[in-house]
Amino acid sequence: DKYGLRAVGFVTGGGNDNLAKIVSKYPDKFIGFAHHYPFAEGAADELRRSVKELGLKGYKLLAPMLDRPIEDPAAYPVWEVCAELDIPVLIHFGIQGGGGGIAWHENINPLKLHNVAKDFPDVTFVVPHFGCAWIRETLQLCWACGNVSIDTCGSNQWVRWVDGDWTTKKLFRKYMETIGAERIIFGTDSSYFPRGFAERYLQDQIRD
């Protein structure tokens, strides 16, 4: 209310049941995404339960934190449930964490999603943070797969660590002229409590 936010999305929350409890406190403002290991035997059932019984609205993964390729067939039942329930899938690719974090992993390249996105054209996949340093690959993925969108959230400080004179303004322009506004999801981002809403992320994007 302080910042005039109409809704807040939570994509991790210490387990699906715990996140559902948090969302239930302000169901008109809070939106939760399930977040659990996709390769487990019961992962598809857990996702269905999280959506149908707990009321969560999507599925979130951190690709560089997984111990198998994102396209591993073991996760296909999960993608099938995403298609069945018509829920969006938010998958973080690119560098992970702050300084000293993960800069290389078998799942760090957004193009790793190519085959999954092709196999499940009815699922909306979202790559956050403009691709988080993997700009070219994210654009190529979006070119090949019309069911892939991007979001703009985060500080996007990674632009200082890539080739080229990138700024948030230039990123907006590049994605606007390639994939179009309808596939760009505006977001701000934050992290663990008690940090709260990072208003400066909002102001940076409005300015640019």
Residue spans for each PLM region:
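H/E-rich (His + Asp/Glu) clusters that bind or coordinate divalent metals
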Residues: 124-126, 131-208
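Active-site gating/metal-coordination segments in enzymes
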Residues: 6, 11-108
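Glycine-rich loops and low-complexity Gly/Arg-rich segments
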Residues: 33-36, 55-60, 83-86, 114-116, ...
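Short, flexible active-site loops
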Residues: 95-98, 121-124, 153
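Glycine-enriched alpha-helix->loop->beta-strand junction motifs that scaffold or abut catalytic
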Residues: 53-58, 78, 84-88, 119-123, ...
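Short, surface-exposed connector motifs at secondary-structure boundaries
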Residues: 2-7, 27-31, 118-125, 182-184
